[in-house]
């Protein structure tokens, strides 16, 4: 089973959009996948679920339940550690790790774990999402929304991953804003300064077919389990 932790360079960069497209390509290619969203916030306007959880379930055509993919959810779209403190919820690294590792014995080809926001999103006053990734010791897929500031955000995230010896399996350029200029130049700059080639360049209204090459890379034997 391949395992990947999906994070963004920031919040609202398209992590869940990328996750759902990866799910779609796995479903079309008969790759057995499961995408978890351990911590979620922001209730959907269409149901009592958090919006990201609902999107993932819809991508799977509801063959999984919310409880199978999500452990902790908050109705308000607020930083997890803030709303957790307000509602007296403990976002425990150990509990999250156990929730994720409980899926390791399932018959899956690939397991995605979609994080909450960016690499250093706080879970409490003394822990961040980075602590969970370090505890799991699995590779990261980084989503960067190509816009003003993305070069700095992407390089900072990659540098922090490198500093903690966390493998970057790939980074995805989410080019969903047609008004942004010099997209290729920004991607090239990130590649040159980070030393990592862009794994996929995704445009607005991308089809799942745009993710086939990326899915082949992720499922390949060369990728660490």
UniProtKB/Swiss-Prot annotation:
UniProt-annotated catalytic positions: 37
Catalytic activity annotation: (7R,8S)-7,8-diammoniononanoate + CO2 + ATP = (4R,5S)-dethiobiotin + ADP + phosphate + 3 H(+)
Associated pathway: Cofactor biosynthesis; biotin biosynthesis; biotin from 7,8-diaminononanoate: step 1/2
Cofactor list: Mg(2+)
Parts forming coiled coils: none
Keyword Transmembrane helix: no
Quaternary structure note: Homodimer.
Protein name in UniProt: ATP-dependent dethiobiotin synthetase BioD
Gene name linked to the record: bioD
